[in-house]
Amino acid sequence: MDRDQRLIEFCQEAIRIPSPSGQEQGVAQLMKRKMEEYGFDEVVIDRYGSVLGRMRGKRPGKTILLDGHIDNVDVIDAGEWTHDPFGGEIDQGRIYGRGTSDMKGSVTAMISAVAHFAEDTGRDFAGEICVSCTVHEECFEGVSSREITRLARPDFVIIGEATSTTVKIGQRGRAEVVVETEGVSCHSSNPDKGVNAVYHMMAVIEEIRRIVPNEHPILGKGILELTDIISSPYPGASVV
C-alpha cells in the first residue's frame, strides 16, 4: 500500500470513531497505536487523555511540536447530512465526515508526515519532532494543550488547523472575561423594594461597547464581543 492510500485509510478510521469532547478515548487509542506502528520513540497518553508522540533525531537540537485536537463537535442533525457523519466516505475526491477538517485529517497527516520524514532521512536530523493529539478543544480550549506544552517543552509549535494551505504566523490570542452584577430579588409588582441586576448589567454592557480593541499591523484589529448573558439565580444576578 502506498503512503497516500495508507494516510487516507488512517483518516477514515479516525473519522469513524465518534469523539465528542470528553469522549475521545477511542480515537486517542487509535492515534497511540498508529504512532507506535510508525516507530515513534515514545508515545504516552497524559492525565487529560491527550496523546503525545516523540520522534528523535540522531543529533541534538531543538524540539518542534505539531499539534492538533482529536475531539469533534457533536452531531445533532445527522438526518440532514448528505453522507454518514461517521462514515468517512469518499465522494469526488473528498472525504466526508464529522471532524475531517477539524481536525482528524490534519492530525493523521502530521503523524504520517513525521513517520515518513524519519524513514526517508534515516533519522539523520537534529532535535526532536513531537506530535500531540489533544482533547477537549471544542469545549475547553487551552487546558489540555497547556499540559502537552509542559511535557514536550517545544521550541517551536505548528498547529494544524485548516488554513486553505496558507501559513499563518500567529494569532491574536483569547481571553474570556466574566462580569457579574448583583441585585436584590423582589416581586415585579414592587420593583422599588429590590435592585434589578439586569439594569445594572445593561449599563456595564454599554460601557464595554465603548471600548476600542487594539489593532496589530499583522494580526489586524482585535475583537471584543458579548457571547452570553445569564440570570442565575434568577432574577437576583446577571452574568455576562
Model region roles, listed by residue range:
Residues M1-L65, H69-V75:
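N-terminal helical capping/dimerization or prosegment-like subdomains
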Residues M103-R172, E176, Y234:
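Acidic/histidine-rich catalytic neighborhood of metal-dependent amide-processing enzymes
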Residues P191-V240:
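Acidic-enriched catalytic cores of C-N bond-cleaving enzymes acting on peptides and small amides
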Residues E13, S112-E119, A203-R209:
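Short glycine/serine- and small hydrophobic-enriched flexible loop segments
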Residues V43, G53, G88-I90, L226-I229:
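A structural signal for short hydrophobic beta-strand segments in well-ordered beta-sheet cores
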Residues T166-H200:
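Metal-dependent peptidase/peptidase-like ectodomains
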Residues K62-C130:
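Active-site metal-coordination/substrate-binding segment of hydrolases
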